[in-house]
C-alpha cells in the first residue's frame, strides 16, 4: 500500500509539473497583436560645409510615438522564448532651429516601420525579460528656408533605412492579455546633397520608451 501511495504521489507531482510548464509555454507562445504608445526622442543632425566652414546642428526634441505591432512567439521549453515581429508607428515630434545663419530648418518625424526578432527568458510563469533587434525604415520631413536667399528653399520627405536594438519586460495580466515596457534605440543611415559650393547631410537617430498592451490568440 505504501508503494502504491508513493507511486500515486509521484504521478500527481509529475502531472502538476507538466501542467505548470505547459501554462508557462502557453503564456508566451503563439501569435499576438498589440497597441503601443510612449516617449519618442528623435535626434537629427544636420551638417552644411563649404570651402571654408563646416556647421553642424542637432535637432533633438521629445514627442509621442503611437502605433501597433504583431508577432509570433515560440517557447521550446519553460525557460526560453524566441519570436519575430513587425510594426508600424507614428510620431508627433517636430523640431525647428537655425542652421547656417539667417535661415530656419524644421524636421518632423514621420512613420516608422519595424521588423525583427526577439529572444527572452521566462522569470516565472508571468514575466518575460527579452532583448530585440532588427530592421527599421523611418520617414523624415524637412522644411528649409533661407531668409538671405543664399541657398534654395527646400521641402521634402525622405525614407531612412536603419536598424534598432532594445530590451524590455513583459507580464501576463490575464487570459491571453499582456502588457510590456521596453526601451528601443534606432540608428538610421545618412543622406547627403551636394552643389558647386556646399555639401549638406542629415543623420538621424532615435530613442523610445514604449508601453504596450496586447492579446495572444
Language model regions located:
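Gram-negative outer-membrane beta-barrel domains
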Residues: 2-5, 12, 18-217
Amino acid at each position: 500500500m505504501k508503494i502504491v501511495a508513493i507511486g500515486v504521489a509521484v504521478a500527481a507531482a509529475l502531472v502538476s509539473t507538466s501542467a505548470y510548464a505547459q501554462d508557462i509555454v502557453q503564456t508566451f507562445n503563439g501569435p499576438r497583436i498589440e497597441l503601443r504608445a510612449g516617449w519618442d526622442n528623435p535626434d537629427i543632425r544636420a551638417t552644411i560645409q563649404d570651402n571654408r566652414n563646416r556647421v553642424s546642428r542637432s535637432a533633438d526634441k521629445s514627442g509621442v510615438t503611437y502605433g501597433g505591432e504583431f508577432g509570433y512567439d515560440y517557447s521550446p521549453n519553460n525557460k526560453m522564448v524566441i519570436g519575430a515581429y513587425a510594426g508600424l508607428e507614428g510620431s508627433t515630434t517636430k523640431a525647428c532651429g537655425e542652421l547656417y545663419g539667417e535661415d530656419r530648418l524644421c524636421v518632423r518625424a514621420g512613420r516608422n516601420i519595424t521588423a525583427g526578432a526577439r529572444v527572452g527568458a521566462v522569470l516565472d510563469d508571468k514575466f518575460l525579460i527579452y532583448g530585440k533587434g532588427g530592421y527599421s525604415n523611418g520617414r523624415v520631413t524637412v522644411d528649409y528656408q533661407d531668409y538671405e536667399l543664399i541657398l534654395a528653399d527646400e521641402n521634402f520627405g525622405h525614407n531612412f533605412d536603419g536598424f534598432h536594438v532594445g530590451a524590455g519586460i513583459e507580464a501576463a495580466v490575464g487570459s491571453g492579455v499582456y502588457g510590456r515596457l521596453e526601451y528601443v534605440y534606432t540608428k538610421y543611415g545618412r543622406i547627403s546633397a551636394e552643389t558647386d559650393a556646399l555639401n549638406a547631410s542629415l543623420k538621424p537617430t532615435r530613442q523610445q520608451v514604449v508601453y504596450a498592451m496586447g492579446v495572444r490568440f
